């Protein structure tokens, strides 16, 4: 039994594993992992499943979907909204997801500047007049570095039970491999792209001559743009309606970066505090477990370690110390923590982010924590 095929051809039952739609989406995912585009647009995005899968690709910073049917997009677009976990642990990358309602036969400046444009099972739904305009909109106006177009291979239809004309009632046409490749090569030549052909949904053994169930053309621009198209190429008015936009929390936004830094600083400070107090307590005379005696024990440690505090502060020691009921943790000590260092980059930025968010000593060289609530 073939890897992508389950069932016997003679029974008239064909089942692809994974399902054919997943194979198409996984094909796009593999391209994204290989070429790492930052801006990706899916034309004919329908229920947004491909966009939902792509939002987990760490290289992508901008995702856009376009479909003629607003209702279909709205059914599942909630999956594109940030989750609580995205706010608790913001990503290092920025991510903006936008959905537009409109036709691929119309130009809109919101679709300029994309690295990759996908058209998965789209073109067979276009009217003849729309198909005529499609190449100019996608390859001429949008002009991304890469375009992926998939469409049914009509030669495979003889293996699909119940298919007499087209696979879907909304299909306006279905091409065989020669027809698709002729159209794709003409389009590629006209707009200075190269094109390679492949597909997903392998045929059963002995029927290889029909080709893949879904045929795919991968177009690559021969001379990638290094800057945005000039202003004169843009239409004066927007043609699409924006129906959804989500801006994901990112550490590139200083608000989220500050929250992450302060949270990590306080977590590390509490660990240092606990370690220091445990060390001081271990050096003192052993007492019973009576709470009062334990407090005396802590005070003994504090008093023993509080000598020459001012000298330590002036020298800006890199080690924490105790004065009275306060623990001083030098900021240099906290900044040396790898995660804090990675988040902030520089000590100056670190100090700026935590100022006003944590309690610092008079010369802002150390973070201050109270020992009073440590032993009750």
UniProtKB/Swiss-Prot annotation:
A GO molecular-function descriptor: RNA binding
Keyword S-adenosyl-L-methionine tagged: yes
Binding-site residues, Mg(2+): 121, 124-125, 171
A cellular component annotation (GO) from this entry: cytoplasm
Names of required cofactors: Mg(2+)
UniProt keyword list: Cytoplasm, Magnesium, Metal-binding, Methyltransferase, RNA-binding, RNA-mediated gene silencing, S-adenosyl-L-methionine, Transferase
Superkingdom of source: Eukaryota
Cellular compartment(s): Cytoplasm
One annotated GO biological process: siRNA processing
Protein name (Swiss-Prot/TrEMBL): Small RNA 2'-O-methyltransferase
Highest classification ranks of the organism: Eukaryota, Metazoa, Chordata, Craniata, Vertebrata
């Amino acid at each position: 039994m073939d890897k992508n095929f389950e069932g016997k051809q003679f029974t008239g039952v064909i089942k692809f594993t994974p399902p054919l739609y997943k194979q198409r989406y996984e094909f796009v995912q593999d391209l994204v992992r290989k070429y790492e585009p930052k801006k990706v647009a899916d034309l004919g995005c329908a229920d947004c499943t491909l966009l939902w899968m792509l939002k987990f690709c760490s290289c992508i910073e901008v995702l856009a979907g376009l479909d003629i049917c607003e209702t279909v997009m709205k059914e599942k677009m909630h999956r594109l909204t940030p989750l609580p976990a995205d706010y608790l642990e913001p990503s290092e990358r920025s991510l903006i997801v936008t959905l537009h309602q409109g036709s691929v036969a119309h130009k809109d400046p919101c679709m300029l500047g994309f690295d990759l444009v996908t058209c998965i099972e789209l073109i067979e739904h276009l009217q003849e007049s729309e198909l005529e305009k499609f190449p100019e909109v996608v390859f001429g106006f949008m002009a991304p570095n890469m375009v992926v177009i998939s469409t049914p291979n009509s030669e495979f239809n003889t293996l699909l039970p119940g298919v007499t004309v087209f696979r879907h009632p909304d299909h306006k046409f279905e091409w065989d491999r020669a027809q698709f490749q002729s159209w794709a090569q003409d389009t590629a030549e006209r707009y200075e792209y190269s094109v390679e052909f492949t597909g997903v949904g392998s045929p059963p053994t002995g029927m290889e001559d029909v080709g893949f169930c879904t045929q795919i053309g991968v177009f690559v621009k021969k001379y990638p743009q290094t800057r945005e198209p000039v202003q004169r190429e843009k239409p004066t008015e927007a043609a699409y309606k924006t129906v959804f936009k989500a801006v994901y929390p990112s550490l590139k936004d200083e608000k989220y970066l500050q929250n992450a830094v302060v949270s990590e600083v306080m977590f590390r400070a509490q660990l240092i505090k606990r370690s220091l107090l445990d060390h001081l307590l271990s050096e003192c005379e052993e007492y019973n477990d009576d709470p009062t005696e334990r407090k005396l024990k802590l005070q003994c440690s504090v008093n023993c370690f509080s000598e020459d505090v001012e000298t330590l502060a002036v020298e800006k020691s890199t080690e924490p110390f105790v004065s009275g009921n306060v623990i001083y943790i030098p900021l240099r000590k906290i900044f040396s923590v790898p995660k804090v260092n990675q988040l902030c980059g520089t000590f100056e930025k670190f100090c700026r982010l935590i100022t006003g968010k944590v309690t610092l000593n008079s010369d802002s060289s150390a973070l201050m924590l109270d020992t009073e609530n440590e032993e009750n």
